Amino acid sequence: MTGYGANRLTVNMDAIIQNFRTVERFVAGKTGIMAVVKANAYGHGIVDVAVALEKNGARMLAVSNVDEAVQLRDAGICVPITVLGGSTEAGIRETVSLNAAQAVYDENALHILQREAVRLNKTALAHLKIDTGMTRIGVKGDDALARLLSVWKDCPNVEMSGMFTHFAAADTDATFTETQNERFKRACACVHAAGHRPFAHAAASAAIAFGDNLWYDMVRPGIALYGGTDCIKGLTPAQRLTSYPVRIAWAEDGDTIGYGRTYTAERPMRIMTVPIGYGDGYKRILGNRAQALVCGKRCNVVGRVCMDQLTLDVTHVPNASMGDEVVLLGRQGIECITPEEMAVWADTISYEVMLGFDSRRVKKVLM
C-alpha cells in the first residue's frame, strides 16, 4: 500500500479496556471510577470508547461540554454522564432533558437548572465545582460557597448529586496538591453542614497515582485510559499512527532537505518521503527532532515537516523499501514510540499529541 490515503490511526479498544481494568485494580475497590471521554475520548472516538467502557462495566462517564453529552445519549449510552465544564444557558437547559449532571459554580447556572427542572417537572442534577487553586472555573473561597449554598435552598428541584475539584499539579507539586486537598475537604464539610450529601471526586489520572487521600468517592481517569501516561504501572498506549513511503532516493553530500534548508546531508543519505504532515496532525515542530520506525528500526525525521509530507533518514536500514509500513506513533517489533516520547520532541504534553491526529485525512481504524 503506497501513496496518499496511506495514513492510518489505529485505535486499540482492547488496550483502552485493559487500561480501565488497570485503574480498577489500582484503586482496589476503595473508590468508584468516572471514566473521562471528553475531547472525542482524547482523540480515540467518543462514541466507540463510551460504548466499550459501558459494556465493560463503567458506571459513570465524564465529558467537557453538553454537545458531547448529546452525542453519548444519541448513541444509546445509559450510564450517568457528568458535564465537567461550564455551559451556555441553552446547554444547561439541555442537561436536564438528557438526565446529565451539570457542573455548577454560580447562581446563574443554578437558577437556570431550577427553572428548567420545574418546567419539565423533573429533578435537575448538578455537580458543585470548587476552585481550590486552578483559577479556572469553580466556587472560590468560603464566603462565595456560603452564598451559593444559601441560594441553593431556594432551588428544591436541583439535586447536588456530586461535588468536585481539579488539581493543578498533582504530578509535580505535592505541597500545593495537599493545599488544594485541604481546601476541598473544608468545602466538603461546608456542603455537608448545609444538608447536602453529594459524592465527591477530585483525582484525575496523576492524582490517582498521588495517593488514596485524594480519591474520595470517585476518581476520574482520563489520560490513563488511553495509555498517554505511565503514572500507573501497566498502562498501554491505545493509538498507532502509520503510513507508507511514496519515494526512497539518495541525497548527495551537501544536499539540503526540505523548506528553509534546515538539514544538510553530510554524507550520501538514503531519504524516505512519507505522505503525512502537519495537515494531518503531525506537528511541524517535529522536523529534525522526531523519529519513526521502519523495519523495526528508529529513523530520524530530517528537514522540516511539511503540510503533507515528511522525510526520514533510512540510510541505516538498507532493506527499507516501498510498501514498508512506517510507524510514527506506536509499536513496531521491539521498538515503541510513545505519546510521551513524541510530546518531548514536540515541546508539549501527551494529551495534545493524542488529540492531534483527529483529522479527516487520517483514517481511523478500530481494532
Where are these predicted regions, by residue range?
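Active-site anion/phosphate-binding pocket segments in diverse small-molecule metabolic enzymes
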Residues: 1-17, 67-68, 87, 105-113, ...
